[in-house]
Structures are given as C-alpha cells and as structure tokens.
Amino acid sequence: MESIIKLIENEGGGFLDFFFHKSKPTVQKDGYKYEIFSIELTEDRTVELTGVQVYPYYEHKLCHLKVDNTWRKTSINHIQNIIQKEIDKIYK
C-alpha cells in the first residue's frame, strides 16, 4: 500500500485520469470488476479509485473505492502496475 502512495507522490500530481482512454484499466475486488476512470491520492494520504462496476453486471453510477488492507495483494500489485504504466506514458 505504501509503495502505491510513494509512486503517486513521486509522480507529482497526485491524480491520474483514465476517462478519455479507449481501453480503461480494470481492477477486481470482492468478486466485482470495476473499470477505472481515475486514481487519486487524497489529502490524508489514502488512494481512491473512481470508476464503474462492470461485472457481474454494469452499474450506471460512479463508485469510489478506497484502496486499503482489505484488498488482495494481487489487486494492489495490479493497481501499482497500472499507475507505473501511466506514469511511464506521461514522461516518455
């Protein structure tokens, strides 16, 4: 979890936007799959994902997911990889 926070802090902005990407990244939590629109580091140093639920059914409202210790390690690693790829695109 701390590695994600440091990665976003080093990026400088604290906010990554995926809204206009043709292929938005997805992440799974508790049997649900979410399409990510943005990743934000909040003022209290927590990471929050904003997106929509796409599995098992599509939900027509924004979800705000706080990334904490309740997430599986594989999902946290996946989020970290998404952030790293986006940062690499920005500074390439």
Segments the model singles out, each with a brief description of its role:
Residues M1-E9:
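N-terminal trafficking/processing presequences and adjacent post-cleavage segments
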Residues K61-K92:
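Mixed-charge, Lys/Arg-enriched low-complexity segments
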Residues I4, F15-F20, Y91:
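Short, aromatic- and cysteine-enriched interfacial helices/patches
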Residues L16-H21, T26-K73:
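Acidic, low-complexity, intrinsically disordered interaction modules
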